Regions:
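Active-site hotspot residues in diverse enzymes, especially metal/ion-binding acidic/histidine motifs
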Residues: 1-308
Length: 308
């Protein structure tokens, strides 16, 4: 019965409909919405690692719930104007050049980026800390019906990994989303190259580079605020370590457990996304919505509203 209802083959009776609403703790108005389900950027994950289909579907559904909430909020308030530079790798050049261009367009000064989340949100892209229910999923991007990008990042990750994930997803938005991509291209590698150059410009990295050791990697992590592993990989890509040095340092990191958890003294605090929360507060503090009214507008219950 439920399977046929889910597939649209059967229409539930009023009694069954009420039961479903009560069990799932959603008001009837939630199921009466006519919103389309948008597929997020899942194809890249399918190519990279194995994730159970049910985990993907659950993530997709939850992401769409957040998207619908945002779209409802945007009927009353405006987001910062969208300023998303677009880049065609086949026409304009390598992902690293795209990252340099974004830094220029967004007027990011030299050196490390102190708060990438704020810069992204200031340019009209919503960042949503999100529980994917799987540590295998770092982040995903999705475009709202009004063409506003939303980046979801795994809220269970450490701050350095969140920053790299944000930059990685931004790379997909800048270079891939909505573009025709030849199958021969490795979009995951391109997004990582973009992220690495955005967060750690090669010219500055090389200028300050010392002899590579675990200690120097830790000190560089403290400054650049991305993982020791990512910095070691960048050094290899820039031919600053030999293959043997690279393997040896990775073996040392694995032996010390750094591949799963890097030393606490180099921890990077997670950045705080504020745009979604500010939209909610604007409705209650300035537009005069009560919690019940706001919950009704979003087609959720007050308990779920408080959890946003």
């Amino acid at each position: 019965m439920l399977s046929k209802i889910e597939k649209g083959l059967n229409k539930p009776s009023e009694e069954i409909f009420t039961t479903i609403c009560n069990v799932l703790e959603f008001p009837k108005s939630f199921f009466e919405q006519t919103n389309n389900i948008f597929e997020p950027n899942l194809s890249y994950y399918r190519k990279r690692i194995v994730i159970k289909k049910r985990d993907l579907l659950k993530a997709e559904g939850s992401m769409n719930l957040v998207r619908m909430n945002l779209e409802n909020l945007m009927t009353s308030v405006e987001l910062p104007e969208l300023n998303l530079p677009l880049w065609d790798v086949d026409v304009h050049g390598a992902p690293e050049a795209a990252a340099k261009w974004v830094r220029q367009k967004w007027r990011i000064p030299k050196g490390r980026i102190e708060n990438l989340t704020k810069i992204i949100e200031d340019n009209g892209i919503v960042v949503v800390p999100f529980d994917f229910g799987s540590e295998k999923m770092d982040g995903l991007s999705l475009i709202s019906k009004d063409r506003h990008p939303i980046i979801y990042i795994n809220n269970k990750m450490p701050g350095d990994r969140q920053r790299l994930t944000l930059a990685h997803e931004l790379g997909h938005l800048v270079m891939h989303i909505g573009q025709q991509i030849a199958q021969i291209r490795n979009v995951e590698k391109e997004a990582m190259q973009f992220a690495s150059e955005l967060l750690v410009p090669a010219s500055e990295f090389l200028q300050d580079l010392e002899t590579i050791s675990l200690e120097t990697l830790g000190n560089m992590k403290r400054y650049w605020k991305i993982s020791m592993g990512a910095l070691l990989y960048k050094a290899k890509e820039l031919a600053q370590v030999t293959d043997n040095q690279y393997r040896y340092l990775w073996q040392q990191m694995a032996y010390l457990g750094y591949k799963t958890k890097e030393p606490a003294e180099f921890n990077v605090s997670p950045e705080k996304a504020t745009l979604f929360k500010e939209m909610l507060e604007l409705h209650t503090n300035e537009l005069g919505y009560t919690k019940d009214e706001l919950a009704n507008m979003l087609h959720i219950n007050v308990k779920d509203l408080n959890a946003l």
